[in-house]
Amino acid sequence: MTNLELEKTANEIRKSIVTAVHSAKSGHPGGSLSSADIFTYLYFEEMNIDPKNPKMEDRDRFVLSKGHVAPGLYSTLAERGYFPKEDLVTLRHTGSYLQGHPDMKHIPGVDMSSGSLGQGLSVAVGMAAVGKYDKKDYRVYTLCGDGEIQEGQIWEAAMWAGFKKLDNLVVVVDNNNLQIDGTVDEVCSPYPIDKKFEAFNFHVINIDGNDFDQIRAAFKEARETKGMPTAIIAKTVKGKGVSFMENVFDWHGKAPNDEQYEVAMADLEKAGEALCQK
């Protein structure tokens, strides 16, 4: 896909995120919106996957370590064709298969159930290690939050991944610098994130995580890196695309009301129209 096609797709995914969270009357729009461009590139350009065969043996694997941004993952999976987009409005509803955190047993395209922060990287490292052991060509991707990496288990997993030279592993950190109760650097600063991963023998790439030129270049560089895992530190805007949500930590975990929903969708419709003029 061209960058313009990716931008248009990401905008549609953002619409779905806002719609799903509004319908649920709860959820996590901020981090879902900041990650939308990463999700889009992974599922529409980077990963070897087949929505018609979600359990394809040689598929690339994805672990959503920051499981609370499930609206972002679900919206991407629906846009990619894993299940009907119409199902997104059942998010968090009683009886729906689309609950607040990813469920690998019931949702097509989900490789790992997640939700308890800090655990996803360990799972991704295990998947990557098995791939190496079995001499498989698949790659493993995981998305972590910058607040999430305050968890110690993240760094145990990183240490082992670097030690084992898992060059089939790519860790993306959604660095929007906001978490549920404030800025990441004020709550418990993990900075400098890049130097920490480098200390554990990762190849590190710093990018603007809302810029497809930089996203594309980063994943290409990761594929070309041999003998060590890659960490992509993606600087993003929390609530990206919705004017009143951008860079506001209050939107970490709450749903827009009806009036706010209309404003958010108008923002995204306007963005879509602008993309059509390019």
Language-model region placement:
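N-terminal hydrophobic or amphipathic helices/low-complexity stretches enriched
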Residues: M1-I13
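N-terminal capping segment at the start of a domain
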Residues: A10-S26, D174-N176
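Cofactor-binding active-site loop characterized by glycine-rich and histidine/acidic residues
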Residues: I17-V21, S32-F163
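Glycine-rich beta-alpha junction loops
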Residues: H68-V69, L73, N176-N177, D211, ...
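Short acidic, glycine/serine/threonine-rich loops at helix termini
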Residues: Y74-S75, D103, Q153-W155, D181-D185, ...
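Thiamine diphosphate
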Residues: G109, S113-S116, L121-E224
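Glycine/aspartate-rich loop-and-adjacent alpha/beta segment that forms the canonical ThDP
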Residues: F212-K278
